[in-house]
C-alpha cells in the first residue's frame, strides 16, 4: 500500500500527517527533510522504548543523526508536573535549541507531555509526533493540543503547539494489546458519531477487521485524521467547532479522574462510555430517537468495549461527585457545564442547556 498524506493547513504552522506501513523504518529520511535539525532528542516511555526505539534510532543513524532518548514510565500517571520537569531538564542537558527537534515516540501520554515540553522549552522547539497507539494516531497526535493532568482534572495544564510532522506507522499498531487497540477504537468511532454517519456505518460493517487487516486500518486512520484536520483548520484553538471533538469527553474525563487515571479505565474506554452516555442524555432530552443510543451501545458491545459506568471495575464516587468532577472540564464557561450532545448519529452539537435531573437519571441508569 502507498503512504497517505493528510495536510493540516495552518499557514506558517502547517504540517503533514503521513499514514501507512513502514514509516518507522523511514523516519530518518522523513525527518532530515525538515530543514536538517542539528540535534534530535527522543522522549518515549519504557514500554515503547523496548518495542520501537531501536528501529527509530537505526533509521536516524542511517541519515547521520545520533539521537539520545529518555524513557519515562508508561501510563497516564506520567502526565504530571514531576515527569514534565524531568523531561524538560533532560532536554536542556542535551542542549536542545530552537532549531533542533524533539521526537515524541509513544501514545497519547508521551505525545501530550513531549509536545508540552517542546512548547515551553526555550519558548518553543520543533517536535515530531510518532504515535504508536491507535488512539494517538487518530486523535492526540494531530491538532497541537499538548499538556499534563492536574489532581483537579485532566489536561488542565497545557498549550497549543503544532508538530512539524506526524508519522503514523500502522504496522506498529500490531504490537498493541487487544485492550489498548480497542481503547483507541473509542476515538475512531467518535468521528462517525460526531459528524459522519456514513463513516459510522462503514465502521459497523468493517471495524471487527481493523486489528488484522492493514488496508482497513489505514483507511480508518486516514479518514479519522482527515476529519480532525478539517476541524482543526477551521478552529485551531477551540473557540467553537473544535469542541465537537470532545464528544464523550465530559463524562469520560470525569470517570478517568474518579478512577485516579489508573488502568481501571483507559482514556479511550472512558470516551466510549462517555459517547454512550451523551447519546442516552440526548434521547432523554428528546434531541434524538432512542434508536441512536441503542445503536451506539450495540456497536461498542460488539467491539468488546465498555458502554456503561457499571462496566468499570471497582468502586466509584456517587453521581453528585461525578458531576462535581465534570465541573472541572475545560469546556466549562461561566461556571456552566457544556456537553457535546447529538440530534442523531453524525449530528453532534455543543450546549449548556442540560436538565440536571435528566443528567442524574442517565448516570444512575448506567450503574
Swiss-Prot record:
The protein's annotated catalytic reaction(s) are: 7-phospho-2-dehydro-3-deoxy-D-arabino-heptonate = 3-dehydroquinate + phosphate
Q: Where in the cell is it found?
A: Cytoplasm
> What is the role of the protein in this entry?
Catalyzes the conversion of 3-deoxy-D-arabino-heptulosonate 7-phosphate (DAHP) to dehydroquinate (DHQ).
Write down the Gene3D superfamilies for this protein, in alphabetical order: 3.40.50.1970, Dehydroquinate synthase-like - alpha domain (1.20.1090.10)
List of residues binding Zn(2+): 187, 249, 267
Cross-referenced Pfam families, in alphabetical order? DHQ_synthase (PF01761), DHQS_C (PF24621)
Give the lineage. Bacteria, Pseudomonadati, Pseudomonadota, Alphaproteobacteria, Rhodobacterales
Instruction: Tell me what this protein is called.
Output: 3-dehydroquinate synthase
Q: Tell me what organism the protein belongs to.
A: Paracoccus denitrificans (strain Pd 1222)
Q: Which residues bind NAD(+)?
A: 108-112, 132-133, 145, 154
HAMAP family, alphabetized? DHQ_synthase (MF_00110)
Q: Which family does it belong to?
A: Belongs to the sugar phosphate cyclases superfamily. Dehydroquinate synthase family.
> Which pathway does it take part in?
Metabolic intermediate biosynthesis; chorismate biosynthesis; chorismate from D-erythrose 4-phosphate and phosphoenolpyruvate: step 2/7
State the InterPro entries in the record: Dehydroquinate_synthase, DHQ_synth_AroB, DHQ_synth_fam, DHQS/DOIS_N, DHQS_C
Q: Which GO terms describe its cellular component?
A: cytoplasm
Amino acid at each position: 500500500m502507498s503512504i497517505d498524506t493528510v495536510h493540516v493547513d495552518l499557514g506558517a504552522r502547517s504540517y503533514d500527517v503521513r499514514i501507512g506501513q513502514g514509516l518507522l523504518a523511514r523516519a530518518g529520511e522523513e525527518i532530515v527533510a525538515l530543514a536538517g535539525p542539528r540535534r534530535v532528542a527522543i522522549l518515549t516511555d519504557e514500554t515503547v522504548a523496548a518495542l520501537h526505539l531501536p528501529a527509530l534510532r537505526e533509521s536516524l543513524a542511517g541519515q547521520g543523526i545520533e539521537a539520545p532518548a529518555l524513557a519515562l514510565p508508561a501510563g497516564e500517571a506520567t502526565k504530571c508536573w514531576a515527569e514534565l520537569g524531568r523531561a524538560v531538564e533532560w532536554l536542556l542537558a542535551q542542549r536542545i535549541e530552537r532549531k533542533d527537534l524533539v521526537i515524541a515516540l509513544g501514545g497519547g501520554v508521551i505525545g501530550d507531555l513531549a509536545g508540552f515540553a517542546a512548547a515551553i522549552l526555550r519558548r518553543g522547539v520543533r517536535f515530531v509526533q510518532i504515535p504508536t497507539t491507535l488512539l494517538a494516531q487518530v486523535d492526540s497526535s494531530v491538532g497541537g493540543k499538548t499538556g499534563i493532568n492536574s489532581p483537579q482534572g485532566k489536561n488542565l495544564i497545557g498549550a497549543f503547539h503544532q508538530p512539524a510532522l506526524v508519522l503514523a506507522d500502522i504496522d506498529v499498531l500490531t504490537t498493541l494489546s487487544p485492550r489498548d487497540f480497542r481503547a483507541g477504537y473509542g476515538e475512531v468511532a467518535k468521528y462517525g458519531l460526531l459528524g459522519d454517519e456514513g463513516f459510522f456505518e462503514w465502521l459497523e460493517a468493517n471495524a471487527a477487521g481493523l486489528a488484522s487487516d492493514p488496508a482497513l486500518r489505514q483507511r480508518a486512520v486516514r479518514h479519522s485524521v482527515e476529519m480532525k484536520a478539517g476541524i482543526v483548520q477551521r478552529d485551531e484553538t477551540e473557540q467553537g467547532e473544535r469542541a465537537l471533538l470532545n464528544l464523550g469527553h465530559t463524562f469520560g474525563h470525569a470517570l478517568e479522574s474518579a478512577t485516579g487515571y489508573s488502568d481501571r479505565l483507559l482514556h479511550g474506554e472512558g470516551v466510549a462510555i462517555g459517547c454512550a452516555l451523551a447519546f442516552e442524555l440526548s434521547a432523554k432530552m428528546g434531541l434524538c430517537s432512542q434508536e441512536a443510543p441503542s445503536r451506539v451501545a450495540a456497536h461498542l458491545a460488539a467491539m468488546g468495549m465498555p458502554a456503561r459506568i457499571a462496566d468499570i471495575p471497582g468502586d466509584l464516587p456517587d453521581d453528585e461527585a461525578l458531576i462535581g468532577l465534570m465541573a472541572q472540564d475545560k469546556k466549562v464557561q461561566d461556571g456552566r457545564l457544556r456537553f457535546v450532545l447529538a440530534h442523531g448519529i453524525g449530528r453532534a452539537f455543543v450546549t449548556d442547556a442540560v436538565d440536571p435531573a435528566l443528567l442524574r437519571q442517565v448516570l444512575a441508569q448506567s450503574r
